[in-house]
């Protein structure tokens, strides 16, 4: 579960008047499915449309990545293409729930052990 610390942003005053305190979340989605196949572009597009866009209708960014991690079960180093989702939103319990929903949906749909996540307090304006 994503820590409830998202509720209490403690960034110092934002430097630009138009900025406000937000949480920046990066989610890392491995595209290797059980060492047999990759989550294809069409499958990713469908996941983006049916899960991510509906969960974050105010906007998000997706980039391609190239990741490497050690499988805790086998000890094997896995190298795989990935997608990186970037979301910036006001800190809240709702944000925490939305991030967890997207992570859980991806793990279930594509048989993944995990989805990586980094959250940090930032100042942002759109």
Place the predicted regions along the sequence by residue.
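Generic marker of residues within folded, mature protein domains
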Residues: 3, 17, 75-77
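Hydrophobic helical h-region of N-terminal Sec-dependent signal peptides
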Residues: 3-7, 11
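Intrinsically disordered, low-complexity boundary segments flanking structured domains
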Residues: 12-16, 48-49, 72-74, 101-105
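N-terminal secretory signal peptides
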Residues: 12-63
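Short, internal active-site loops enriched in acidic
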Residues: 32, 68-69, 122-123
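Short, intrinsically disordered low-complexity segments
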Residues: 53-82
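Helix-rich interaction surfaces within compact, conserved domain-sized segments
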Residues: 77-126
């Amino acid at each position: 579960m994503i820590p409830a610390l998202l509720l209490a942003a403690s960034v110092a005053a934002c430097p630009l008047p138009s900025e406000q305190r937000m949480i920046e979340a990066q989610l890392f989605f491995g595209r290797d499915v059980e060492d047999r196949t990759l989550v294809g572009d069409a499958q990713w597009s469908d996941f983006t449309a049916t899960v991510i866009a509906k969960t974050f209708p105010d906007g998000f960014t997706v980039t391609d990545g190239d990741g490497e991690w050690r499988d805790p079960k086998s000890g094997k180093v896995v190298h795989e293409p990935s997608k990186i989702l970037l979301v910036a939103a006001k800190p809240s319990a709702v944000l925490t729930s939305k991030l967890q929903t997207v992570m859980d949906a991806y793990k279930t749909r594509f048989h993944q052990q995990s989805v990586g996540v980094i959250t940090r307090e930032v100042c942002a304006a759109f």
